[in-house]
Amino acid sequence: MKLNPYVIFLVVSVVMTLACGNMASAQNQGDQPDIYEQAEQEADRLQRLLDLEDWQVFYVDSTLKHDFPAMMAEYDELRKAKVANQSMYQSVHDKWMEQIDNSYKKFFTQEQWTAYLKSGAARAQKAREKRKAKK
């Protein structure tokens, strides 16, 4: 049985969205790393994956430490407004992931950008474009 890549991506996106919501409540409990630690972990992962220079790691870390909390703030606004429409949460996620990718493209080399896309970012971008086209 072959799974539809769109369905897989949608499931992963929903899980990520729910995880972000749970992450905010878990911050108070100390169960999971906070949003800044997650940004550092992602910067470290990309450094290993893409062989980033120190200055590039700094920019990745700075980008994520700005954009992750901003995305979480938008999630909180939706949650406080008692929005139940999952597509609105997905739109917020897509907006911030697109902004992060645009930032990365500015300071990654062409080889790093290609490797980043091959690591799964290209699939995510295509899925975002499909969702955007449906609107």
Tell me the role of every PLM-derived stretch:
Residues 1-31:
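Bacterial Sec-dependent N-terminal signal peptides
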